[in-house]
Amino acid sequence: MTRLGVTVFLATLVMATEYPAPLVREEQEIVVDGHKEVWQLRWATAPEAFCSPKLISLTCPCLGFAYGESGDLSLIRLRDGAEIDRMHLTQFFSEERERAMLQRWPADPDKDAGAANERDFADRVMQRPAVQVMQFGDYDHESAGSEFYLQTGTQPCGKSAGIVVGITAVSPHLHPVTTASHPDRPLVLFKHEWEALRDAKTSPLDILDTPCGDHGAETETHVLIRWGRKGIDGSRREYTCPAGGAPKKLVRQDPL
């Protein structure tokens, strides 16, 4: 089957069986300021297959996107059935692709690696429950949990990196989470760093970003994050990797 054929088949199957409505990848109910809303992840046109169910999709570049879809994507707020807010999400993904990517069906690398070459493998994958993208949480520690993590890329090897989007104390409209130092650009962190921030009880928070030796890293990198009334802020710090148990030394520090 040609790439175009696979794309059309996947899009048709998904829309017919799992999409809440045509082009709506996912919708979730949420309460904002006492009002019930429906938030939708909506494609502008039928999405194409991305990292389709094959063995190669279990490799590092596809981690978090395996068995997914790509296209032009927006996040939309509906109240009483009427659109009240919209944010274009494609702009936050790779400029080279100019497309947003979302995982559609979950991958199981341990089991899938041995089954990926079987003829009915793709059919079995598409019977799995869809991955829930909008998993709301309180990342800025100032809102009612109306933000969610959105993977926008991967880093070697297969580290999920992305942004958090939604509504925070900074603005009542849809927006990406930024920092006080750089309010004009989305804050990009690894998924485990966003999760640590969401679950943290005290500020500041020191998170290991890249350990010594990770893919040849000659320094150890930490992310220091603090939050308060002015929003989220912090720094990225690099330390030496001394031998023999000697203490690490700070060699570089940049604001987030």
Please place each PLM-identified region on the residue numbering.
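Short helix-loop boundary/capping segments
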Residues: S146-H192
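Hydrophobic h-region of N-terminal signal peptides that target proteins for export
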Residues: T7-T17
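A short, amphipathic edge element
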Residues: P22, V125-M134, P186-K191
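Acidic, small-residue rich beta-repeat scaffolds with periodic aromatic anchors
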Residues: A16-E83, F190-L256
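Beta-propeller fold detector
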Residues: D85-T90, L174-P183, G234-C241
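Bacterial N-terminal signal peptides that target proteins for export
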Residues: M1-V6
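A glycine-rich, hydrophobic loop/mini-helix early in the fold
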Residues: A82-D138
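Acidic/hydrophobic-patterned starts of short beta strands in beta-sheet-rich repeat architectures
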Residues: W39, D138-G153, D199-L208
